[in-house]
From Swiss-Prot:
Localization annotation: Cytoplasm
Protein name per UniProt: Ribosomal RNA small subunit methyltransferase G
Residues noted as binding S-adenosyl-L-methionine in the record, renumbered to the chain: G73, I126, E127, R142
NCBIfam families according to UniProt: rsmG_gidB
Organism for this UniProt entry: Methylorubrum populi (strain ATCC BAA-705 / NCIMB 13946 / BJ001) (Methylobacterium populi)
InterPro entries: rRNA_ssu_MeTfrase_G, SAM-dependent_MTases_sf
UniProt enzyme class: transferase
This protein's UniProt keywords: Cytoplasm, Methyltransferase, rRNA processing, S-adenosyl-L-methionine, Transferase
C-alpha cells in the first residue's frame, strides 16, 4: 500500500528519479530516527508519503517561483527539509530550518547531508532568528502554533514583502477569525490536496490592528 502511495505522489508532483531517491533516503532516515526520537505521530508513518511528503510538496505548487524559504519549528523537516530536497536542482533554492530542539536539529543536519538538500539549520528559538533574516520569499510552518502566534513570529518578514504559507486543519477558519482581531492582512484559503478538510493559509501585507 505504501508503495502505491509513493508512486502516486511521485507521479503527481513530477518528481525526478534523483529526487525520488533523495526522498526515499528522507523516509528511511525518518523511520530510523523515529525509534529514538518521536519526530512524527507513530500512526502516520504508514502513510508517510501522503501525510508528510505530499503535504509538503504541495507548497511548491502554490509558490513555484519562490527560491528562499524559512521554515519555523522544523521538527521532522516537514515541510522545510522535504521542500529543500525537491528544490535541489533549482538555481538559488535554499531553505532555512529553525528548530530549538538539538536532537531534532541533529536529524535535520544528518538527513540534509545525506540527501544533498540545500539548507541551513538554526538550532535556536524563532525569536532569535527571524528578526535577522532578509530576502526571504516564503515563511512557512506546519503543526506548530495557532495562526495568531505564527503571524506574531513572522511579523518582521510579513510586513516586508515575504509571503506566509501556513498549512492548517479543519480549524483554519476559526484561527483566521481569531487572528483578524489582532492583525490586518490579505489572505487566501487554499484547499489542501492531501486532506479535504485542511487548508493552506496564504498571508501577505501584514499589519497590526490599531488599539
Amino acid at each position: 500500500m505504501s508503495t502505491d502511495l509513493r508512486s502516486r505522489v511521485l507521479t503527481e508532483h513530477n518528481v525526478s528519479r534523483e529526487t525520488a531517491q533523495a526522498l526515499d533516503l528522507y523516509v528511511a532516515q525518518l523511520t530510523r530516527w523515529q525509534t529514538v526520537k518521536n519526530l512524527v505521530g507513530p500512526a502516520t508513518l504508514s502513510e508517510v508519503w501522503q501525510r508528510h511528503v505530499a503535504d509538503a510538496l504541495q507548497l511548491l505548487t502554490i509558490a513555484p517561483e519562490a527560491r528562499r524559504w524559512l521554515d519555523l519549528g522544523s521538527g521532522a523537516g516537514i515541510p522545510g527539509l522535504i521542500l529543500a530536497i525537491a528544490g535541489r536542482g533549482r538555481s538559488g533554492f535554499h531553505v532555512e530550518l529553525v528548530e530549538s530542539n538539538a536532537r531534532k536539529c541533529a536529524f535535520l543536519s544528518e538527513t540534509a547531508r545525506l540527501t544533498g538538500a540545500p539548507v541551513t539549520v538554526h538550532n535556536a528559538r524563532i525569536e532569535a532568528v527571524i528578526g535577522h533574516r532578509s530576502g526571504i520569499d516564503i515563511v512557512c510552518a506546519r503543526a506548530l502554533a495557532p495562526l495568531t502566534q505564527l503571524l506574531a513570529w513572522s511579523e518582521p518578514l510579513l510586513t516586508s514583502g515575504t509571503v506566509g504559507l501556513f498549512p492548517k486543519g479543519r480549524d483554519a477558519a476559526a484561527e483566521l477569525t481569531e487572528a483578524e482581531d489582532a492583525w490586518t492582512f490579505t489572505r487566501d484559503l487554499i484547499p489542501s490536496r492531501t486532506d479535504s478538510q485542511a487548508r493552506i493559509v496564504r498571508v501577505t501585507s501584514l499589519s497590526r490592528v490599531d488599539p
